[in-house]
Amino acid sequence: MAKNYYDITLALAGICQSARLVQQLAHQGHCDADALHVSLNSIIDMNPSSTLAVFGGSEANLRVGLETLLGVLNASSRQGLNAELTRYTLSLMVLERKLSSAKGALDTLGNRINGLQRQLEHFDLQSETLMSAMAAIYVDVISPLGPRIQVTGSPAVLQSPQVQAKVRATLLAGIRAAVLWHQVGGGRLQLMFSRNRLTTQAKQILAHLTPEL
């Protein structure tokens, strides 16, 4: 069956968006708020009608992820910020495979996410309460699967409990995107053998987004 590279690219951009937000948080203590909302909201939507619907139904919601994806696909340097983004992206893919193969882990994750939906009736998505709850899901369900993702950045920034919670919640969103990526036919071999196809698709999507003013 022919691969749907549009859906694969969107899901891959979702992983990369989480990677970029984690990087911003770790270095600066804050990140693109709109992109963060899109990524966190993707965790909550358990029954989306399409791949794009996971990310709010708009390609523009993945602008950060698509731009990051192009950087990761075309990274010539093994050092610096691009290397960090590549490491986070690949690490999320590895953890997703462990999640999918661990007995009962996906069910546990689903049950815990259902609990978030109840909390959303009383608290905002980006409230400290929800951030802490999503971070706890990451720590309880994802982290034990190993290997842990080593987040690098400013030590002073990373000491903040609020930043730690946001980073873990954002990594959980990355896992959500990685699960979606496999569901729509994504696989790590594509990063080696279909790099040009993915690059072209990402550029096409970005090309018809309205430019940021």
Swiss-Prot record:
Q: Topology versus the membrane, per the UniProt entry? A: Peripheral membrane protein
Q: Which Gene3D superfamilies match?
A: HflD-like
Keywords (A to Z) from UniProt: Cell inner membrane, Cell membrane, Coiled coil, Cytoplasm, Membrane
Tell me which stretches of the chain form a coiled coil.
Answer: 79-126
* Bilayer-spanning residue ranges: none
Question: Which InterPro entries does its entry note?
Answer: HflD, HflD-like_sf
Provide the family line. Belongs to the HflD family.
Protein name according to UniProt: High frequency lysogenization protein HflD
